[in-house]
Amino acid sequence: RETTGLICQPAYALHSFWGCHFRCAYCNLGHVAHVYVNVEDWVEHIERSFSELENSPEQNLFQWDNGSDIVCWEPEYGGTKLLIDLFSRQADKYLELYVGKSDHVDFLLDYEHRGHTVCCWSLCHEAQTREVEKRTASMEGRLLAARKCQEAGYPVRIRFSPMVPTVGWEAGTRHMIQRMFAEIKPEVLTIEPLRFF
């Protein structure tokens, strides 16, 4: 918005997977996974839908999949490769791949994304990761994964999400930010408070 100086990047939400194998204390996505198994048909439907969006050329970001840390299920699921291939062929559309709290990215490094896939991490300080976000990658693991993706040419975004006021969170967050800038150069930073749906 011009009057506030804030930047808002609206995006279409793409979902083919709900559920998460992580066990973050604040999250309700765990325990049961709901999966589209006809992922090839789903990706073809997305491609056909692009023509309907020609009247909104400024709307060119598609986020997949906030309902799960989707890369945890890859490459076996197969959706990431199909979507990266699809978006790499688009002149003006971009996929935001929600890597979330994972460090599982080695399968992504050789994909031909042509700069049309953005990798987005949720980053939290180490004490929060250890105490509140069970089964997730460590802060350092996420930063290493983000660096690998950035070195493979992927644009990288970071969400400080959620900000949970654990004991020592201020010092932990300062350290996290210093480590982040020492390892990567994120193109966008987002701060999200703890929230419940």
Which residue ranges define each predicted feature?
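Short, glycine/acidic-rich beta->alpha junctions
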Residues: 19, 79, 171-172
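Gly/Ala-rich phosphate-binding loop of Rossmann-like dinucleotide-binding domains
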Residues: 28, 88, 150
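Alpha-helix termination/capping residues and helix-transition junctions
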Residues: 21, 56, 182-183
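Core AdoMet radical
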Residues: 31-144, 155-159, 188-192
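Short cysteine clusters
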Residues: 20-27
